[in-house]
Swiss-Prot record:
Binds to the 23S rRNA. It comes from Thermoplasma volcanium (strain ATCC 51530 / DSM 4299 / JCM 9571 / NBRC 15438 / GSS1). Binds 1 zinc ion per subunit. Keywords: Metal-binding, Ribonucleoprotein, Ribosomal protein, RNA-binding, rRNA-binding, Zinc, Zinc-finger. Belongs to the eukaryotic ribosomal protein eL24 family. Zn(2+) binds at residues 6, 9, 32, 36. A zinc finger (C4-type) spans 6-36. This is Large ribosomal subunit protein eL24. GO terms for biological process: translation. It comes from the Archaea. Its cofactor is Zn(2+). The lineage of its organism: Archaea, Methanobacteriati, Thermoplasmatota, Thermoplasmata, Thermoplasmatales. Pfam families: Ribosomal_L24e. One of its GO terms (molecular function) is zinc ion binding. One of its GO terms (cellular component) is ribosome.
Length: 66
């Protein structure tokens, strides 16, 4: 089985867990929890600005290096 990563927070999702969401345009999004799904789809939040996501921490590291 292929381990997938969450489309919102960036965590790895073990096979048999998580949520697969298919948009109308055919894009497939994988979520590790309902929290991630609600933040991305329901609340339209961008992962770069949510503090508990991996993308936020990577961006923060880049800012502190410069």
């Amino acid at each position: 089985m292929l381990a997938r990563t969450c489309s919102f927070c960036g965590k790895t999702i073990e096979p048999g867990t998580g949520i697969m969401y298919v948009r109308k345009d055919g894009a497939i999004l994988y979520f590790c929890s309902n929290k991630c799904k609600k933040n991305m789809i329901g609340l339209n939040r961008v992962p770069r600005y949510v503090r508990w996501t991996n993308e936020y921490h990577e961006l923060k590291k880049m800012r502190t290096r410069s």
